[in-house]
Amino acid sequence: MLNLKADHPIGIFDSGVGGLTIAKAVIDNLPNESMIYFGDTKHLPYGDKSIQAIQGYVREIVDFLLEREVKLILIACHSASAAAYEMLQNYIGNRALLVNVIDPVIKFLSENYAGKRVGLIGTKLTIQSGIYHKKISELECQIDLCALATPLLVPIIEEGFFEH
């Protein structure tokens, strides 16, 4: 059973600063919550790393967040979600809630694009993991997913290109 306290912070992490957009959405929707954001710019980008390396990085980040008694950990990185979500579920156990960024995207697609063709760009790891295809096929929502690995995506996001 989870032993969470309402006044404990929410922990959010990403391989860099791109997850700050998700952190902002959390702040906008939950303005009374405190938050700890961890941007792992030391190992940026995750998308070209091995699954084992990413799992090691995120285990250290999760330890850092758990030491600060977060009640919820939000993985704001698609590559980390693809590589480590299941491992982190087991690792964290009942010490905190765990949320990834892939499941909400799948839910949105299934509710709004069933029977349609959808394009997906992502890191090499995210695309090669097949996680989006797997989750879409489990829902049987007939989405024709066209996925393309885009190596320059992370540098573009990290440089703030979309803000200009």
Q: What is the role of each PLM region?
A:
Residues M1-H164:
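Non-catalytic structural scaffold of enzyme domains
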